[in-house]
């Protein structure tokens, strides 16, 4: 699967290079006779962020459109090279999140194992992309003044993002008056929760910088001569399985994790035994019996609880995650200012 995505990224780069060569091959694209079609915009916007992966399975992707949704902010510079094609440089800061406890309750019958697993994460991404924008409908007007009142478009590009997945430790009664309290966010990569880089594991520690391929569709509306409004939804392909810090394979042995990263590594790796949701602070016992019976396919004791021998229901031999890569969707609503609003007439020779 990862090789397939790498091939897709390579083909995308080739496609962009081909499209760019076509644009530059047009006679005198930057000649005085052609600049009449060119102008630039700068934009700022924001929207929602949607994660898909081990904690939001693709088989239930529709839940991910409204569950554990977070936010993003963006800035961009766009240069319209022809009436129907543009190049855009964008920077986005996006927060992604996933939570087994919250997501699995959308369909506990089908996601009982996820409920028992009880993992969660938060990841703040700093994404830099270069994209080509192509109008879906033809535009015949020239320059900024000739742009259409409404124009649907598609975008495809390549880029990089920095990231750092984090999670909270188990909720504890550490409040000022002894009340249940959320714990601070902790970076997960150093803890090697899926066995990355541990003796006997082939998986190497992952990088905090990864490639990304944005594929988007949007609509651009002309507010007036100086401003545009853009609504865009973009799917991000990335050959990476650790946006959520959850890899494939069985849980690493508790003793092995503890020998490398101490008890903290083991505690963040296997979380089926936590009584309370680390994010919601609610007791997991209410649905635990149902999830345990569904997952184990046997009747369990009425007094069963997460803290009562959880390994008998969700053993360390369980798969911590799948081999499928992670991805995300960004919706972005942008206000753009037109930098060049005058048609530049070439000199008569």
Describe each model-derived feature in a short phrase.
Residues 44-48, 75-79, 130-136, 156-160, ...:
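Residues on the lipid-exposed face of transmembrane beta-strands in outer-membrane beta-barrel proteins
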Residues 133, 324-349:
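Outer-membrane beta-barrel "beta-signal"
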Residues 83-85, 91-186:
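Gram-negative (and chloroplast) outer-membrane scaffold detector with strong preference
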Residues 47-76:
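Surface-exposed strand-loop-strand hairpins of Gram-negative outer-membrane beta-barrel proteins
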Residues 29-30, 58-64, 113-121, 141-142, ...:
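Extracellular loop and loop/strand-boundary signature of outer-membrane beta-barrel proteins
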Residues 38, 67-71, 124-128, 148-150, ...:
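Residues that define the transmembrane beta-barrel architecture of outer-membrane proteins
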Residues 52, 84-87, 139-142, 226-229, ...:
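Repeated loop/turn-to-beta-strand initiation elements of outer-membrane beta-barrel proteins
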Residues 177-201, 254-325:
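Flexible glycine-rich, low-complexity coil/linker segments exposed to the extracellular/periplasmic environment
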């Amino acid at each position: 699967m990862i090789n397939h995505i790498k091939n897709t990224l390579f083909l995308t780069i080739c496609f962009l290079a081909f499209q760019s060569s076509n644009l530059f091959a047009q006679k005198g694209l930057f000649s005085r006779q052609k600049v009449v079609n060119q102008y630039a915009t700068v934009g700022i916007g924001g929207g929602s962020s949607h994660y898909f992966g081990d904690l939001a399975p693709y088989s239930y992707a529709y839940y991910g459109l409204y569950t554990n949704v977070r936010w993003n902010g963006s800035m961009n510079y766009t240069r319209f090279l022809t009436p129907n094609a543009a190049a855009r440089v964008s920077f986005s800061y996006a927060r992604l999140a996933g939570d087994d406890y919250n997501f699995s309750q959308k369909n506990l019958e089908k996601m009982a194992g996820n409920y028992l697993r009880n993992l969660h994460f938060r990841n703040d991404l700093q994404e830099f992309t270069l994209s080509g924008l192509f109008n879906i409908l033809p535009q015949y007007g020239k320059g900024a003044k000739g742009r259409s009142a409404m124009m649907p478009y598609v975008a495809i590009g390549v880029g990089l993002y920095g990231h750092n997945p984090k999670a909270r430790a188990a909720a504890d009664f550490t409040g000022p008056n002894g009340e249940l309290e959320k714990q601070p966010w902790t970076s997960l990569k150093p803890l090697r929760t899926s066995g990355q880089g541990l003796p006997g594991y082939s998986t190497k520690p992952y990088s905090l910088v990864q490639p990304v391929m944005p594929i988007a569709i949007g609509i651009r509306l002309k507010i007036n001569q100086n401003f545009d409004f853009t609504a865009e939804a973009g799917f991000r392909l990335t050959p990476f399985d650790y946006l959520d810090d959850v890899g494939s394979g069985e849980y690493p042995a508790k003793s092995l994790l503890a020998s490398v990263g101490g008890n903290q590594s083991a505690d963040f790796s296997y979380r089926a035994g936590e009584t309370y949701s680390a994010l919601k602070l609610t007791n997991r016992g209410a649905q635990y019996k149902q999830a345990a019976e569904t997952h184990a396919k046997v009747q369990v004791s009425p007094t069963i609880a997460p803290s009562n021998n959880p390994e008998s229901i969700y053993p360390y031999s369980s798969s911590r995650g799948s081999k499928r890569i992670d991805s995300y969707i960004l919706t972005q609503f942008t206000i753009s200012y037109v930098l060049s609003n005058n048609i530049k007439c070439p000199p008569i020779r």
